[in-house]
Amino acid sequence: MKTDVLIVGSGCSALYMALHLPEDLNILMVTKKEAELSDSFLAQGGICMLRNEDDYDSYFEDTMKAGHYENDAYSVELMIKSSPDVIQDLINYGVDFERNEDGSLAFTREGAHSQKRILYHEDITGKE
């Protein structure tokens, strides 16, 4: 079997990457079980987004602390700073995050986060 790109996994990151590769590539995704059994699909929580620059330092510290300061700081910075664009991509792909009555995105606080910066879809964010 010949392929241009082999992606191991079928979770959110793998799917997002596949969607951002050139369409003329032959892409093969390999997963150990059905996609519906991936951790991403089964996830009930949400996805974090930098709401504004004032939250950057807190978001960075929360992420580093949750990773016991073993995280790669550059990767954490890249993840945080790119999160608004990633969320907009997901919305453009049709992900239906919860909204407030005024139509703005609804945020909640979960886990190690000190601020409300989690977007979610009901209690089935991974399926969405």
Residue ranges and their predicted role:
Residues T3-M29:
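N-terminal Rossmann-like FAD-binding beta1-loop-alpha1 element of flavoenzymes
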Residues A35-E128:
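Conserved N-terminal/central alpha/beta ligand/cofactor-binding core
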Residues M1-K2, E110:
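A short, basic/flexible loop-to-alpha-helix module at the beginning of a structural domain
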